Amino acid sequence: MTHTRSHTLFDQARRIIPGGVNSPVRAFKSVGADPLFIKRASGSKIFDEDNNTYIDYVGSWGPMILGHCFPEVVNAVKQCMENGSSFGAPTELEITLAQMVIDAMPSIEMVRMVSSGTEATMSAIRLARGYTGRDKILKFSGCYHGHADALLVKAGSGAATFGVPDSPGVPADFAKHTLTAEYNSLASVKTLITENSGQIACIILEPVAGNMGTVPPRPGFLEGLRELCTNEGIILIFDEVMSGFRVAYGGAQSLYGVTPDMTTLGKIIGGGLPVGAFGGKREIMEKLSPSGGVYQAGTLSGNPLAMTAGIETLKFLQQPGFYDRLEEKSSQLSEGISLAARDAGYPLYSTRVGSMFCAFFTPHEVFDWTTAAACDTKAFARYFLAMLEEGVYLAPSQFETAFMSAAHSQQDIEATIAAARKCFKLIR
């Protein structure tokens, strides 16, 4: 494949955009290449500026569960656009999507729409602090919750990719209120709670960690957190920006049967448009302005285009058998890639929850950030570039999740497994 046009555009972009991209992991820096510039997408495919075609397992980092340019979503957004793109005023669309979210998520009795996942987690933490009157928060190494100052401490996703989990520009006075435990370790949580008794406002985590690869919760981990939070008066927040409506219609909380006090959402609920949301128990959410004293606002919150795309997307997710079909395809692909690695004699540890999956370049179990960080990132980079040449587009980082969509066909899956089989032999 040739990437001449992408190289040219990247050179132009670097002169006027920091790093040449508007989100760091897109730069392909960790895989030692220049990024692809994408021209368009349709179904399971994306097409770059050099007219190369790729089977896409990034899916805009999760939102495109129906595939790209899903006709009903596109048509609904076009129709909505004819009435105006933004009003800065309430619309019926906000009520419709809010009710759909409430009906789906066990933890949500009231919900506030925002414009990004970062806004959602930032606002949820502020609300938890306001509700409890406590300052400290507890998060987990390798879990990424957006780029708010309080959460860029031992973070995953792009921060992990570039080896800087603590960002310059975050004052020590902010960071000192953020406690960090080890994912899947109740013992580390209990120690921090004991050391900071009565000071922790909330525990926030990805119930399925998706920003250090895909790391499922071990049996009893989520249940243990729920019990600890109840006993200590701590707000339990599930960051389901990635897992919400992805691993199940009711998110990870529905899949695992553990109900948090608050939930943050994004990605899928906007159908590919910028969106976020946070919700939870009525008694907590009513502390939010204008009904309460905890302030939060946004010019484009509840944007009608995003609400429309979200409504249309969720309608299709409700169809009988949707998640069963997605599960079957995801299982086939994940197992096929694992088998291809084994047949090539290549060490690999595969994980999957629903349509989220990851191939870790290590022979050892991955269950937290320490074990994820031990992966062979150089081998992953070789694999990534080889797969790209075979027309398979993966996230350009070992520490990201791959996503299946409803648009991926049996032919796509078979072609991807065949490409993986070839690439594992090449990089061995």
Curated annotation (Swiss-Prot):
Modification N6-(pyridoxal phosphate)lysine, positions: 267
Pathway(s) it belongs to: Porphyrin-containing compound metabolism; protoporphyrin-IX biosynthesis; 5-aminolevulinate from L-glutamyl-tRNA(Glu): step 2/2
Pfam families: Aminotran_3
Cofactor(s) listed in the protein's UniProt record: pyridoxal 5'-phosphate
Keywords noted in UniProt: Cytoplasm, Isomerase, Porphyrin biosynthesis, Pyridoxal phosphate
Source domain of life: Bacteria
One function term, GO molecular function aspect: pyridoxal phosphate binding
Gene Ontology biological process: protoporphyrinogen IX biosynthetic process
UniProt similarity note: Belongs to the class-III pyridoxal-phosphate-dependent aminotransferase family. HemL subfamily.
NCBIfam families: hemL, PRK00062.1
Protein's UniProt name: Glutamate-1-semialdehyde 2,1-aminomutase
